[in-house]
């Protein structure tokens, strides 16, 4: 679970990177479909699933909106992300293993876009936070 120190580190990092969240989301989702091509199956209804396409940008923005929500609900991720968990479990039917894949891509993108802010301490706190988000999103799968 997240310590007080982890929560403070996540909030501090988010305050620095949130202005770039659309670009982070686009790059992370683009990276995910290239590095893990099996994830494209969730987007097969889109006419263009190439990195940086309009649909990828729009969904990347939506994903990062979810991350922003999670930061605001950091003290109770399960309750705060319940609606998103239900949507991913029942409507979208996303395999929860993919949350970990996308989390990894988000970490990679943030590390490359914000190398000075992505200290080892920020890295571990953000990784723990994103793992908590993935667990909260998987809550309705049980």
Curated annotation (Swiss-Prot):
Tissue-by-tissue expression: Red blood cells.
Ligand binding (heme b): 88
Alphabetic keyword roster: Acetylation, Heme, Iron, Metal-binding, Oxygen transport, Transport
Modified residues (N-acetylserine): 1
Gene3D superfamilies assigned: Globins (1.10.490.10)
The Globin domain, residue ranges: 1-142
A Gene Ontology biological process term: hydrogen peroxide catabolic process
Signal peptide (UniProt feature, chain positions): none
Summary of the function given for this chain in its UniProt record: Involved in oxygen transport from gills to the various peripheral tissues.
Further details from the record: This fish has two hemoglobins: Hb1 (major) and Hb2 (about 15-20% of the total). They display the Root effect and the alkaline Bohr effect, which is enhanced by organophosphate and to a lesser extent by chloride.
Subunit structure: Hb 1 is a heterotetramer of two alpha-1 and two beta-1 chains.
The name this protein goes by in its record: Hemoglobin subunit alpha-1
Taxonomic source organism: Gobionotothen gibberifrons
């Amino acid at each position: 679970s997240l310590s007080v120190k982890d929560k403070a580190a996540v909030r501090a990092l988010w305050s620095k990177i949130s202005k770039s969240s659309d670009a982070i989301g686009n790059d992370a989702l683009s990276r995910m479909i290239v590095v893990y091509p099996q994830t494209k199956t969730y987007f097969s209804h889109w006419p263009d699933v190439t990195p940086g396409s309009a649909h990828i940008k729009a969904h990347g923005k939506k994903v990062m909106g979810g991350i922003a929500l999670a930061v605001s609900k950091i003290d109770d991720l399960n309750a705060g992300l319940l609606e998103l968990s239900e949507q991913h479990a029942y409507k979208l039917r996303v395999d929860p293993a993919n949350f970990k894949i996308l989390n990894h891509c988000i970490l990679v993108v943030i590390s490359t876009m914000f190398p000075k802010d992505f200290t080892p301490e920020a890295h571990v706190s953000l990784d723990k936070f994103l793992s908590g988000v993935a667990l909260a999103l998987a809550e309705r799968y049980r």
